[in-house]
Structures are given as C-alpha cells and as structure tokens.
Amino acid sequence: MARGKFITFEGIDGAGKTTHLGWFRDRLEQKVAPAGRSVVMTREPGGTKLGESLRDILLHEAMDLETEALLMFAARREHLAQVIEPALARGDWVLSDRFTDATFAYQGGGRGLPRDKLEALERWVQGGFQPDLTVLFDVPPDTASERRSAARAPDRFESESDAFFARTRAEYLRRAEEAPYRFAIIDSTRSIADIQKQLEDLIASL
C-alpha cells in the first residue's frame, strides 16, 4: 500500500481549529476507508504516553524559554517515532492538532526565540519531514481572545496577551507565505458552514 498522508491543523488559541477537527476526521475517513486506510487523529504536544506527560508540564509549569522549545521537540521526536511515521508507513493518514509550525509561531514568534535555533532542532528531529497539508485557521487576536474567554479555564499559553498572539499569528502567516504549496489558509471569522465547505473542497483535492 502507498504511504499515507500527513495533515496538520494550526492556528492561535481561539482560532477555532479544534471545532472542526472531529468533523474533518470523519469526512477524511469516508474518503480513505474504501481503499482500506484509516485516519489517525493525534495532537501536539502529546500523542504518546511520554508526549502527554510533557504536555501537562508544558501547559501548566513555568520554565525557561529554551527548555520549553527543547521539550516541544522532544515530545515531537517521540510522536514521530511512535505514532506518525508508523501510521504513514502502513498507508494510514494522520491528522494532527498542531505540529512544528506551532513551535515556530509560539516559541519563535510569540516568545522571541531565534529562528535559527528552532531550525536546527527541526533539522535534527525531522530531517526534511514536513506535512503534506497544513490547514491554518486564521483569526485576529481580539476575536480569538473573546472566544478563549468564553471557554474553559485557560492554560499557560491561552493566558498570554493579545500582543503575544499578534506575534504568533504573524509568524504563522510568514510560514504560510514561505510554503504556499502545503498551506491552506482558512478565514476563521466566517460561519461554521462556510468553513466546512472550504474544508470539503480541500479533502476533495487530496
């Protein structure tokens, strides 16, 4: 069986990506199941026993900026080795809530970690591995802030300022501009129905 495809959902907290994950997974299953493939839905940080333990630390414990980035990539290496690569090799498709673009956006854009340090970690952990498709849910920081305030108690990242999320969003958009061949940008201020229509079109194009 041919290798599967790797799809990631990205966006600042409050962009609405999680709202569409389960729906997208179900539609994707309908597309690939006739060929005997499955869709593995996962997340970062997380996706493995070790990754989920690191996720709890990353979301709730204060730490040095470089420590934060190193833990993100440590969780990612385990995620690739234990979940993503094996699934793709057996022909399944993988749908992940965040991947490396989030680290460049949050630790790089938001926190200001130099890009060359993140690029060095990316080369070490991933080689040249990248998603086949990255769906970026884009929304202004003030809109995202309103959505977050109506949700559950915020974690360490969700509690950041609008200025932090403006920098994070800008880095996401810079990444998308650099790699238009794999990015699809979703205007997440639109209705759920309009967004899902665009997602349907993306699935049909895969």
Curated annotation (Swiss-Prot):
One of its GO terms (molecular function) is ATP binding. This is Thymidylate kinase. Its EC number is 2.7.4.9. It comes from Paraburkholderia phymatum (strain DSM 17167 / CIP 108236 / LMG 21445 / STM815). The keyword Manganese does not apply. Disulfide bonds: none annotated. It catalyses: dTMP + ATP = dTDP + ADP. Pfam families: Thymidylate_kin. ATP binds at residues 11-18. Keywords: ATP-binding, Kinase, Nucleotide biosynthesis, Nucleotide-binding, Transferase. Gene3D superfamilies: P-loop containing nucleotide triphosphate hydrolases. HAMAP family: Thymidylate_kinase. InterPro entries: P-loop_NTPase, Thymidylate_kin-like_dom, Thymidylate_kinase. GO terms for biological process: dTDP biosynthetic process; dTTP biosynthetic process; dUDP biosynthetic process. Signal peptide: none annotated.
